[in-house]
Amino acid sequence: MSGAAAGGRGGGSWGPGRGGAGGLRRGCSPPAPAGSPRVGLQPLRATVPFQLQQPHQRRDGGGRAASVPCSVAPEKSVCRPQPPQVRRTFSLDTILSSYLLGQWPRDADGAFTCCTNDKATQTPLSWQEPEGERASFCMHKRSASWGSTDHRKEITKLKQQLQRTKLSRSGKEKERSCPVQGDHAALGAGRASLPSHPPGPPVLRLSPCLHRSLEGLNQELEEVFVKEQGEEELLRILEVPDGHRAPAPPQNSSCDHSLLLEPGNLTSSPSVPLASPQPPSQASREEHQGATEELASIHGNKASSPGNPAFLEDGSPSPVLAFAASPRPNHSYVFKREPPEGCERVRVFEEATSPGPDLAFLTSCPDKNKVHFNPTGSAFCPVSLIKPLFPSMGFIFRNCPSSPGSPLPTASPRAPRKGPEASKASSLPSEPWQRSPPSEESVLFQSSLVV
């Protein structure tokens, strides 16, 4: 292939600038001259036909014969490749930074810089095409690197202009909406011709049907949902529903005592309330006097008692200094929790308060006016009951079977005594409970409850 290419460049008897109709066959025999008549079918060629686009002959190889391919081989050493027109970047960082930012690296003067020549990476000059024949084919090239130097310079200038217009237009796009809904290429060209000026106030609100950028869309949504609603609608949205609202702060006139005794309502200076429009020094003096009088009137008896050191901590006679100490259970603090945010204060009925000394101790026993108890004494002693409260004893014990171990004897009439000897003899073998047998009036009971 290289021999065929060299033969095409050298010219010779094949014609000006043509490398033959079908190239060369793979072999040493030279092809037939172009003017000789072809007889019959030609053998199958093993090379791909090609044609060079060079109308003129080279000056250095014009007088050499091109009939033999090896005769034009020394031409390669004669032709020196010109400096290539391949652009190289300065460093890898330049490529990466510009690629990530979406910008094309450009030179200071807008032209190509001088690059070093490397035979291993440069394209030979023999493969390049002259500018005259390439003018008609420049629109069909795949990229700008296949074109001429002027074409690539023009493309580079266009890219630089586009980058400059993008940079100057980036500040304007945040505040301006797109006036055209369809084609944006014409919009970009029109904006590139506009002179750059400092950003002014935002453009007036356009119709919502027009296209907007991301910032414009956010602004439009904000106007729809916030600004277009009236003041009453905004107040209704911002109003906290009933039950979710935190309790109102207590008034100073009615809740001075709670403000003084609750440590949650005290600031860093414990005698100064939260909402104090006066200076701290003057307010602390006035509050100190007021707290002293109020606490002296409320806790006068407690402070006078020797066993209760509520207001005399660390030997200080001032009652307000008890609030500044650590919250010890010394009866100088009211341990009350403020309700959490969003909850209302509920007044609880105080049941667990300790009774005063004038109140009697309440027992859990039943009322003595309704229930009457009769003490029975020992369980083994006979007790005489009130007769009208019970029926006759004979009727009660008539149905009860008598047993030898039964503690309740049967009510039977006794035999009359015969004499003192007989009574002594009869009383000896008898049990202790049989010595005085009960009559109908007295029966052995352990206890009785009379209602």
UniProtKB/Swiss-Prot annotation:
* Chain positions found as Phosphothreonine: 353
Q: Which residue stretches belong to region Disordered?
A: 1-83, 164-183, 242-293, 403-451
Annotated Pfam families: FAM117
- Which residues lie in Gly residues bias regions? 1-25
Task: Spell out which residues are annotated as carrying Phosphoserine.
Answer: 29, 67, 193, 213, 318, 326, 412, 426
Q: Could you list this entry's UniProt keywords, alphabetically sorted.
A: Coiled coil, Phosphoprotein
* Ranges annotated as spanning the membrane: none
Supply the InterPro entries for this chain: Glcci1/FAM117
List where Polar residues composition bias occurs: 436-451
- The source's superkingdom equals Eukaryota
Coiled-coil portions:
149-175
Family label: Belongs to the FAM117 family.
This chain belongs to the protein called Protein FAM117A
